[in-house]
């Protein structure tokens, strides 16, 4: 009798586990969960809840570790533009700083513990979302290029939130989680590393702008060459049926005939796959390059930067816009310096 009961319990447990696995990996669900989603959902929820609470009500954070806390919350007097989740204090450095490592909750908040909690959970969730894209593509028999394209923004987020703080030795150097904080990070990064004069930045700008140009160009050509399936009194959009096998626009009329006649005939592509490939490849490679540039700068490898002034054959200085940029960097460095003293050090040391 006991043997029969044990077998029935084992079969029930096996059935429940198999049912759970089938539900997790089922492509018939309204939202695909997947095994990566099992980790993605709780981590992103934790990051989102902590971000909202910290953005609204976090106390001041001693981000520079010099007992001069910075207020970043809405309750502290900021608006939606200036508010941000302030990075973890420089006094913590790169140490893992969960709540139980602090002596009290007030100390954890004062040292910027929520920033580390948000960033680490968010990055885990982002990379799990990438894995979820690959997993769903695999189960549907699709190729994995959707996940490859998403790896660009995932790499960019990892670069500014994790790689750069690791290279600089402190989470206090990470990107503040806010609108004004983002621009603050950009200015400070430019002042310290002159990223605008680095080839990786040029590739990033070219890729993002090139992808935006192709997207607007292709979208406008598609809208302009829709195949009418309705009368003149009805909208052309009403002629589309979800899942229809017929094409909705004339690709050759838009790209080859129209675009080819506006410029060089070679600009008019005849293959829609080539257009969509470049629309995906340009921004993806560009953002990859930008993320690589931030990773290089994180460890102060500035050898590819154009920081030197141009001299003629007689050694005389030739002013360029690069020199203006270098001077601007020096000014931003002075403004960015924490607790800056504008007196000479020897004079300040006099009794």
UniProtKB/Swiss-Prot annotation:
Positions marked as site (Cleavage): 348-349
Localization: Cellular thylakoid membrane
GO cellular component: photosystem II; plasma membrane-derived thylakoid membrane
Protein's organism: Synechococcus sp. (strain JA-2-3B'a(2-13))
Family the UniProt entry places it in: Belongs to the reaction center PufL/M/PsbA/D family.
Membrane topology note: Multi-pass membrane protein
Taxonomic path: Bacteria, Bacillati, Cyanobacteriota, Cyanophyceae, Synechococcales
SUPFAM superfamilies xref list: Bacterial photosystem II reaction centre, L and M subunits (SSF81483)
Subunit record text: PSII is composed of 1 copy each of membrane proteins PsbA, PsbB, PsbC, PsbD, PsbE, PsbF, PsbH, PsbI, PsbJ, PsbK, PsbL, PsbM, PsbT, PsbX, PsbY, PsbZ, Psb30/Ycf12, peripheral proteins PsbO, CyanoQ (PsbQ), PsbU, PsbV and a large number of cofactors. It forms dimeric complexes.
Reactions catalysed according to its record: 2 a plastoquinone + 4 hnu + 2 H2O = 2 a plastoquinol + O2
Chain sites annotated for binding [CaMn4O5] cluster: 173, 192, 336, 348
Binding residue positions for a quinone: 218, 264
Gene responsible for this protein: psbA1
UniProt-annotated site: Stabilizes free radical intermediate, residues: 193
Pfam families for the chain: Photo_RC
The keyword Protein biosynthesis belongs to this UniProt entry's keyword annotation: no
Binding site for pheophytin a: 129
Protein name: Photosystem II protein D1 1
């Amino acid at each position: 009798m006991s043997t029969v009961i044990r077998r029935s319990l084992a079969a029930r447990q096996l059935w429940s586990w198999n049912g759970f696995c089938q539900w997790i990996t089922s492509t018939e669900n309204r939202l695909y969960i997947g095994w990566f989603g099992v980790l993605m959902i709780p981590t992103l929820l934790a990051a989102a809840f902590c971000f909202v609470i910290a953005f609204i009500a976090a106390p001041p954070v001693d981000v520079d570790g010099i007992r001069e806390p910075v207020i970043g919350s809405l309750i502290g007097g900021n608006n939606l533009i200036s508010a941000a989740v302030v990075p973890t204090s420089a006094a913590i450095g790169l140490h893992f700083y969960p709540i139980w490592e602090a002596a009290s909750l007030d100390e954890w908040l004062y040292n910027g513990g929520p920033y580390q909690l948000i960033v680490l959970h968010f990055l885990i969730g982002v990379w799990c979302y990438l894995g979820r894209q690959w997993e769903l593509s695999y189960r549907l028999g699709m190729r994995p290029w959707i996940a490859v394209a998403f790896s660009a923004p995932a790499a960019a987020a990892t670069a500014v939130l994790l790689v750069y703080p690791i290279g600089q030795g402190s989470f206090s150097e990470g990107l503040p989680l806010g609108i004004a904080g983002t621009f603050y990070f950009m200015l400070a990064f430019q002042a310290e590393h002159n990223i605008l004069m680095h080839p990786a930045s040029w590739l990033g700008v070219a890729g993002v702008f090139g992808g935006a140009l192709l997207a607007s160009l292709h979208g406008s050509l598609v809208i302009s060459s829709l195949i009418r399936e309705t009368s003149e009194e009805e909208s052309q959009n009403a002629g589309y049926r979800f899942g229809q096998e017929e094409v909705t626009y004339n690709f050759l009329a838009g790209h080859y005939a129209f675009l080819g006649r506006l410029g060089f005939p070679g600009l008019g592509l005849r293959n829609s796959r080539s257009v969509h490939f470049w629309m995906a490849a340009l921004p993806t490679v560009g953002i990859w390059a930008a993320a690589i540039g931030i990773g290089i700068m994180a460890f102060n490898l500035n050898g590819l930067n154009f920081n030197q002034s141009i001299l003629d054959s007689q050694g005389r200085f030739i002013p360029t816009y690069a020199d203006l940029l270098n001077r601007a960097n020096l000014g931003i460095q002075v403004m960015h310096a924490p607790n800056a003293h504008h007196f000479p050090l020897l004079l300040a040391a006099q009794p």
